[in-house]
């Protein structure tokens, strides 16, 4: 979850990205309706969305790959912040070209904002026949304002709560956009994320009824404990206590964006967890807390730490693509 969590794959993944250039195809634009389900009143209030129609734009991206194409997609965030560049959600859509309806997955990145790992998984998913919408979280990449130190995960937990709320609402719109694509099976929508992306994904999975499949890698719950105990987040704790904040207040704030808090809403859905037995960033006890709260879904433990889990990258790619590609037993 920490900034240096690049998963050690930047060099490899950049090679996959280097050949990309904007294609000469025509841009696309249109409208999508977000229609709340009948379960919307049961959604926690801070994550609810009203019915709305929103515009989107697509721009084709050239790739040497076969079997899928790639588009840059943008649409307005349902949250308007003080920073205009953060109010547009930027995504990359990896679309399988085979005929028929395809499952589709929202892909979420790590804390450090190194997008290449997410692109690597998105490419693998698309090659496997699974549409992948890689969503860039608030204040990352093109959403980061110049000259202002504002982040989705901040030294001020109140800012972190606001950033995570916006992320979940953006993901909910992303799910609506995916469901509206003619090549997508709207009954088979999922979410996948690594580290911060896994935590955010688990929260979104519990909140958004349209998401029926969830895979969370190097993630966990009890996020206040992760933030408070991590030696690399000393500045966060120091700033909070210097402002007169208590540990109890800190934990109460983080509880509002902890996937464990809402995990009972995800029980009965299809899930897979991929975790590191010796994770020094997301302690195994925090992973187990989320696992228990979700109803003890299938979990794979790698004999690795948060960073050395790179040794299992190909196993992870295979497991993730199979999980989203193959129907559940009761669907086959």
Give the location of each predicted region.
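Short beta-strand/loop motif that positions the catalytic acidic residue
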Residues: 266-267, 272-275, 279
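N-terminal targeting or regulatory segments adjacent to alpha/beta-hydrolase or S9 domains
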Residues: 1, 6-79, 83, 128
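Conserved alpha/beta-hydrolase "acid-adjacent" motif
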Residues: 280-286
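Catalytic histidine-centered segment of alpha/beta-hydrolase-like enzymes
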Residues: 304-317
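Gly/Ser-rich "nucleophile elbow"/oxyanion-hole loop immediately N-terminal to the catalytic nucleophile
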Residues: 151-194
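Cap/lid segment of the alpha/beta-hydrolase catalytic domain
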Residues: 107-168, 229
